Design a protein with these regions (language model features):
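Hydrophobic faces of well-ordered beta-strands that scaffold small-molecule active sites
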Residues: 2-9, 52-54, 79-83, 100-102, ...
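Short, acidic/polar
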Residues: 32-45, 88-92, 144-155, 206
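Glycine-enriched alpha-helix->loop->beta-strand junction motifs that scaffold or abut catalytic
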Residues: 48, 76-79, 93-101, 119-126, ...
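Conserved anion-binding
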Residues: 9-29, 96-172
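N-terminal beta-alpha supersecondary unit
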Residues: 18-62
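Charged helix-capping and loop-helix junction motifs
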Residues: 64-71, 142-153, 176-184, 234
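N-terminal active-site wall of soluble small-molecule enzyme domains
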Residues: 43-94, 180, 184
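Glycine-rich phosphate-binding active-site loops on the catalytic face of alpha/beta enzymes
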Residues: 88-90, 97-114, 168-171, 198-232
Length: 234
């Protein structure tokens, strides 16, 4: 089970994400029991995770970027990043060695297909993030709006992807636990390695995910509050 540490970065600082309510995000030091800094490199130096997922909240919301920091982060840990990709040329903005995450909140299905094909030509692959809120798909593509996430998972099966992230923003930072009915259906529907983001509250959830066949989990809150040992991400 891949335990991937999450860095939500806004205006150069790591913030505590809660239920996708971005206006209320606060520096991670106001929440964490573990870190003394919200500066990304300093935080990584303290926690030493092997693998990280970075959400560049500035790029996702169209207000600046944290690309320099992402490049530096990739020198300290294996890195995947969501930079709000909405055009094929956005792939070129990512620093080398960083795996692109194509989130449905900003990327259309046609863009996801084009990006997967382009990356395959260069021997690399992207991850797709199925972005949801309260179980409903968040989609920039009008053609995806209202589509069932399980149906979308099936429609991605023909693509050459590194994996698919299931990210329900309503569960992010909330330690709500697992929707086992949905997750079992997702595991059955997808041919790709699946990674869950949002809601994981402790080690028992990681064990349940592994039993369902998930490849990994995005972790932040449960690490910062001590419910999941730091050793899991190191």
């Amino acid at each position: 089970m891949r335990c991937i540490f999450v860095l939500d970065i806004l205006n150069g600082a790591v913030v505590h994400a809660l239920r996708g309510e971005r206006r209320s995000y606060r520096p991670i030091t106001e929440f964490s029991r573990l870190v003394s800094t919200s500066e990304p490199l300093g935080l990584l130096g303290e926690l030493r995770p092997q693998e990280v997922y970075v959400a560049d909240l500035n790029l996702i919301t169209g207000k600046g970027d944290n690309l320099k920091a992402i490049g530096e982060i990739s020198g300290m840990a294996k890195t995947m990043a969501d930079i709000g990709i909405s055009r094929l040329t956005d792939l070129d903005r990512l620093p080398p060695k960083v795996s692109p995450v194509l989130g449905t909140e900003t990327a259309s299905l046609s863009l996801i297909e084009e990006a997967a094909a382009k990356l395959a030509q260069h021997g690399s692959r992207a991850l797709v993030s199925i972005d949801m809120k309260k179980g409903r798909l968040l989609a920039a593509d009008p053609g995806l709006a209202g589509q069932d996430p399980i149906s979308l998972l099936k429609s991605l099966n023909h693509l050459d992807l590194e994996g698919v992230i299931l990210l329900d923003l309503e569960r992010v930072g909330a330690s709500t636990g697992l929707d086992t009915v949905f997750l079992n259906a997702a595991a059955e529907a997808s041919r790709h390695p699946l990674i869950l983001g949002g809601g994981i509250k402790g080690e028992e959830d990681l064990e349940a995910l592994e039993e369902m066949g998930f490849a990994g989990a995005l972790l932040a809150t449960a690490v910062h509050n001590g419910r999941i040992p730091l050793s899991k991400i190191q």
